[in-house]
């Protein structure tokens, strides 16, 4: 996967390219990340990238010419058809379904806004989709862009050591993840559930599914409203609720 990024602070993306799973993916050639700084496309000695908004009001907007030139240069450098995304509080909220949709694209170009945003005409003429990571405002689009890159790259074949890890993550099947345990068997008088050490794969699978359903019911019940549960899932959820209410 190729990801281009338009940002006034391209150095921030070293946390993606140099570390963790995404850093390993870059080293293996599975993920390519390139950045363009609108300041490099300015024509004045001050390298100005912001301008006053028409109609007045607080704050500044990103200047049109440097931003548009950066976008055009980045698109020309892309290895193929590219989806252009603007990270914006007004965009579609990113969730697991959206992540999987975006992961079907081989090339993405992410535009990171700053100040009060960008000229609406840039969005209309250059942007394919707007995406948000939540109903809150940040100082820029860099962290949302890194969030998107991290989540989407998990679905690039070979990025995760075990691709099933992505398929079994929270939200991958519409549910929250089940609890996980490692050594020691006893920690502060709390024991690992016996079923996980039983070696019975069927029982382990059912326990994990039951805990996943129960955790979703407890913490994010609205997620269950959009799911068509199987007979097995309904039975396991009913058992979890009964056991929970009996405590």
Swiss-Prot record:
Subcellular location field: Cytoplasm
EC supergroup of this enzyme: transferase
GO BP terms in the entry: tRNA N1-guanine methylation
Positions annotated to bind S-adenosyl-L-methionine: 113, 133-138
Disulphide-bonded residues: none
The organism's place on the tree of life at top rank: Bacteria
Pfam family membership, one: tRNA_m1G_MT
Catalytic activity: guanosine(37) in tRNA + S-adenosyl-L-methionine = N(1)-methylguanosine(37) in tRNA + S-adenosyl-L-homocysteine + H(+)
InterPro entries xref list: Alpha/beta_knot_MTases, tRNA_m1G_MeTrfase_C_sf, tRNA_m1G_MeTrfase_TrmD, tRNA_m1G_MTases_N, tRNA_MeTrfase_TRMD/TRM10
Gene Ontology cellular component list: cytosol
EC number(s) reported in the record: 2.1.1.228
Keywords: Cytoplasm, Methyltransferase, S-adenosyl-L-methionine, Transferase, tRNA processing
One function term, GO molecular function aspect: tRNA (guanine(37)-N1)-methyltransferase activity
Assembly and interaction partners: Homodimer.
UniProt function note: Specifically methylates guanosine-37 in various tRNAs.
Entry's family note: Belongs to the RNA methyltransferase TrmD family.
Protein name according to UniProt: tRNA (guanine-N(1)-)-methyltransferase
Organism of provenance: Vibrio campbellii (strain ATCC BAA-1116)
Lineage per the UniProt record: Bacteria, Pseudomonadati, Pseudomonadota, Gammaproteobacteria, Vibrionales
């Amino acid at each position: 996967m190729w990801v281009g990024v338009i940002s006034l602070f391209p150095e921030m993306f070293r946390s993606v390219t140099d570390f963790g799973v995404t850093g390993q993916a870059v080293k293996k050639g599975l993920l390519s990340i390139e950045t363009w700084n609108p300041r490099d496309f300015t024509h004045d000695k001050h390298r100005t990238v912001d301008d006053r908004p028409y109609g007045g009001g607080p704050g500044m907007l990103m200047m049109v010419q440097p931003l548009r030139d950066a976008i055009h240069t980045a698109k020309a450098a892309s290895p193929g058809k590219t989806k252009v995304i603007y990270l914006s509080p007004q965009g579609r909220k990113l969730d697991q379904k959206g992540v999987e949709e975006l992961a079907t694209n081989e090339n993405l170009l992410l535009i990171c806004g700053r100040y009060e945003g960008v000229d609406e005409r840039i969005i209309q003429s250059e942007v394919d989709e707007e995406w948000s990571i939540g109903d809150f405002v940040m100082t820029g689009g860099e962290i949302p862009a890194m969030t998107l890159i991290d989540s989407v790259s998990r679905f690039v074949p070979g990025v995760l050591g075990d691709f099933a890890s992505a398929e079994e993550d929270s939200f991958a099947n519409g549910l929250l993840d089940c609890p996980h345990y490692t050594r020691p068997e006893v920690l502060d008088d709390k024991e690992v559930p016996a079923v996980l050490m039983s070696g019975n794969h069927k029982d382990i699978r059912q326990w994990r599914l039951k805990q996943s359903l129960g955790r979703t019911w407890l913490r994010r019940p609205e997620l269950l409203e959009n799911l068509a549960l199987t007979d097995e899932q309904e039975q396991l959820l009913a058992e979890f609720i009964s056991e929970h209410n009996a405590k």
